[in-house]
A protein has these predicted regions:
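Membrane translocator/pore-forming domains, dominated by Gram-negative outer-membrane beta-barrels
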Residues: 1, 7, 51-52, 91, ...
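Outer-membrane translocation/initiation segment of Type V secreted surface proteins
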Residues: 5-188, 254
Length: 341
């Protein structure tokens, strides 16, 4: 039995396999000393497998040429000559169990982390698309200026993403965001303002793929028009500086630009109840980095918000609300490029 240690130095791998050992036969067996009995080469994981008389690194069953079946032999009638058996104990031979090759290639730790972090970046930017009600509340008190703060903590779960021949592990992330801003009334119906924000997403890749982080520092401007009949239009432009890294990737920096527009109308009901249908459309662009294409997406949301106002004895107003939203996010085919993929 023999042990092989493999170091990835960027050599090209053709057709999903590379031959490590060539033999003319024999019963020699080989196994890897690498952790988990596998090697990450470019986008995929590779395992040691026997192909005929040779031993190869392969990323799936389809990459290995199957051994042709042995033609059947017609047995002859045996001639048995009884003899006294001689029992000679043999030293047991322990053959290491070869790993079972996957049916389709599995993403390498590096590829899974980079693709998943790219998703996490877009999620974090879109998660901070604050609607007018989240940012300003029910602005109908006629005040000339407002200062506001918004803290959001959420947990998101993404299923596996198809990447062509393979798929990601999927991931969960905990998002913590803080935004602080101020605005002033230009007219009775128009308000202009700005804000700064800081966010972090702690990303947990499913399976044995480890963890990652995405951080964001952002600054933005907005203009909100609120008509007397309850119709409002809210426009936001925002710049974000993103930082992403994981257990297996170095820290990378990105620039993200977002334009968002929201339209809605508030209907006043009895006893300080209000109902507000609303729609939002946003565009986001995240810059490229080394082997990563730039990423652009269109985010759309339609929703309904129901609120109830309470006037407190100290002059404060309390307004709990509930909202339901349908959200879609469409992006073009942004790619991450690897050798051997």
């Amino acid at each position: 039995n023999h042990k092989i240690g493999v170091t990835n130095q960027g050599a090209n791998v053709a057709n999903g396999k590379v031959t490590l050992v060539e033999t003319n036969g024999g019963n020699a067996a080989f196994s890897l000393t690498n952790p988990n009995n596998r090697v990450d080469l470019g986008a995929y994981q590779y395992f040691l497998a026997k192909e005929g008389n040779n031993w190869v690194l392969a990323n799936s069953k389809n990459a290995v040429t199957p051994t042709p079946p042995v033609a059947p032999v017609t047995p002859n009638k045996p001639v048995v000559t009884p003899s006294k058996p001689v029992v000679t104990p043999n030293k047991p031979v322990v053959t290491p169990t070869a790993p079972v090759l996957p049916s389709t290639p599995l993403l390498s730790d590096l590829a899974n982390a980079q693709v998943s972090l790219r998703q996490a970046q877009l999620l974090l930017v879109e998660d901070n698309l604050s609607g007018i009600h989240q940012r300003l509340g029910e602005v109908k008190n006629g005040e000339k200026g407002n200062v506001w703060a918004r803290n959001v903590n959420s947990r998101q779960k993404l299923a596996a993403l198809s990447t062509g021949e393979s798929e990601t592990s999927g991931f969960k992330q905990n998002v913590h965001s803080l935004q602080v801003g101020a605005d002033a009334a230009v007219t009775d119906n128009l308000r202009l303002g700005g804000f700064v924000g800081r966010s972090q997403a702690n990303v947990d890749f499913n399976g044995d793929y480890g963890d990652g982080k995405v951080r964001s520092n952002s600054v933005g401007l907005y203009a909100a028009y609120l008509a007397d009949n309850g119709i409002y239009v809210d426009n936001i432009v925002k710049y974000s500086r993103l930082h992403a890294n994981s257990d297996l990737t170095e820290k990378r920096h990105y620039n993200a630009y977002t334009i968002s527009s929201e339209l809605g109308k508030r209907f006043n009901l009895v006893n300080d109840w209000t109902i507000t249908p609303q729609a939002q459309l946003a565009w986001t662009h995240i810059s490229s980095q080394e082997n990563e294409d730039s990423l652009s997406s269109v985010y759309s949301r339609i929703g309904l918000r129901v609120a109830k106002g309470f006037a407190l004895s100290n002059g404060w107003n309390l307004q709990p609300y509930a909202a339901v939203n349908a959200i879609t996010s469409k992006n073009r085919s942004s790619k991450i490029h690897y050798a051997n993929s």
